[in-house]
C-alpha cells in the first residue's frame, strides 16, 4: 500500500509549498524549514537509485518501504527540486518516457494526472523542449485523432475529455 504511513510525495509537495511561501513572504524560516524537510526526504526516501513512495513506523523508527516505488514519486522529487543527483535526473529523462508500456526496474507506471504532467513540467524546467515535443506527440496524438480530445488515462476506459489535459 503506497500511501500507508508517511507519504513522501505529500511531504515533497509540502516542502515545495514552504519554499514558495517563504519566497513570496520573504520568510527565511519557511525556506529553512523546506530545506530541512528536503534533506530528510532525501535521507529516508532516496536509495541512490529511486525515491520510494512511503515509510512506516516500526519499533518507533521510520522504515522506508523500498518495494513501493512509483514513477510519479520520482517526478514529484524532480519537479519540486528535491532530487539533486545528476545521474538520477539523466536516468529519469532518458530511461523513462510517456508512451512506454513498462518502466525499468519494475517502477510502477504513472497515470496522466498527476505523474505524467509533472514529468512534462519538469522537462520544461530542464529546457528539454525536443523531448517534450516528441513524448507529447507520441502519448497524446492517437487520443486526439480518435476523439478530438485528451483523456484521463492512456486508454479510453475513463474520461475521454479530461479537463486537466487542457494544459497541454
Model-derived features: positions:
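Active-site core of glycosidic bond-cleaving carbohydrate-active enzymes
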Residues: 1-168
Amino acid at each position: 500500500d503506497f500511501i500507508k504511513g508517511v507519504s513522501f510525495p505529500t511531504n515533497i509537495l509540502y516542502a515545495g509549498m514552504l519554499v514558495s511561501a517563504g519566497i513570496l513572504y520573504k520568510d527565511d524560516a519557511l525556506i529553512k524549514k523546506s530545506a530541512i524537510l528536503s534533506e530528510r526526504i532525501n535521507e529516508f526516501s532516496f536509495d541512490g537509485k529511486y525515491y520510494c513512495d512511503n515509510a512506516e513506523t516500526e519499533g518507533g523508527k521510520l522504515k522506508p518501504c523500498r518495494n513501493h516505488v512509483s514513477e510519479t514519486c520520482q517526478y514529484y522529487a524532480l519537479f519540486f527540486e528535491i532530487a539533486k543527483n545528476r545521474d538520477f535526473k539523466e536516468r529519469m529523462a532518458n530511461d523513462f518516457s510517456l508512451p512506454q508500456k513498462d518502466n525499468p526496474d519494475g517502477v510502477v507506471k504513472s497515470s496522466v494526472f498527476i505523474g505524467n504532467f509533472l514529468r512534462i513540467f519538469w522537462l520544461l524546467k530542464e529546457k528539454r523542449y525536443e523531448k517534450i515535443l516528441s513524448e507529447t506527440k507520441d502519448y497524446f496524438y492517437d487520443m486526439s485523432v480518435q476523439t478530438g480530445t485528451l483523456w484521463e488515462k492512456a486508454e479510453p476506459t475513463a474520461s475521454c475529455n479530461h479537463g486537466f489535459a487542457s494544459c497541454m
